[in-house]
A protein has these predicted regions:
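Extracytoplasmic cell-surface/polysaccharide-interacting catalytic and binding patches
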Residues: 1-56, 150-156
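Glycine-rich, flexible loop/turn motifs
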Residues: 6-8, 74, 83, 114
């Protein structure tokens, strides 16, 4: 399914690719012919259409997915939350090209998108760079919950 595009700029493969899954031998693929995977794929498509594609089109810059869909095994392997929206295809982490651009993206997303969560996240307090986590509830009820500086690993 590497060539299955969900929107003009986002493919399903971008959301299932994971270096952790590859290193640990975890199958993180989604198959559209499987009934249990179809809703997850629809959720990812909705995230692209309502969140990522508008961002891409507004700024005219590539939006790189650093973490998209995670099967439960992969989610445990990366230390994800037990209720992570990554497991349902409702969330993505996006890599920002640099902090200044990332801040512009974050501000634009807060102002122009309907979202469930929008988080400016970094690995440790000392990390100079950050990524953006964005999620949309498939049920359409978006909380517009914003966290501006989540530290992933408080012990570092």
């Amino acid at each position: 399914m590497k060539d299955m595009y969900l929107t003009p700029h986002f493919s399903l493969e971008e959301f299932t690719r994971s270096s952790t899954a590859s290193a640990k031998g975890i199958d993180n693929s989604l198959n559209p012919s499987r009934a249990d995977h179809r809703q997850v794929i629809e959720n990812i498509k909705n995230l692209c259409e309502q969140g990522l594609e508008p961002l891409r089109q507004h700024f005219g810059q590539p939006v790189v997915i650093s973490s998209g869909y995670r099967c439960p095994t992969l989610n445990r392997a990366v230390g994800g939350a037990k209720t992570s929206q990554h497991m349902t295809g409702e969330a993505a982490d996006i890599r920002v090209p640099d902090n200044a651009t990332g801040m512009k993206w974050f501000a634009w997303m807060m102002e122009h998108l309907e979202f469930d969560q929008l988080i400016k996240e970094r690995a440790t307090k000392a990390s100079p760079t950050f990524w953006i986590h964005v999620s949309l509830n498939a049920n359409g009820r978006q909380r517009q919950h914003v966290i501006c500086n989540l530290i992933k690993n408080q012990t570092s």
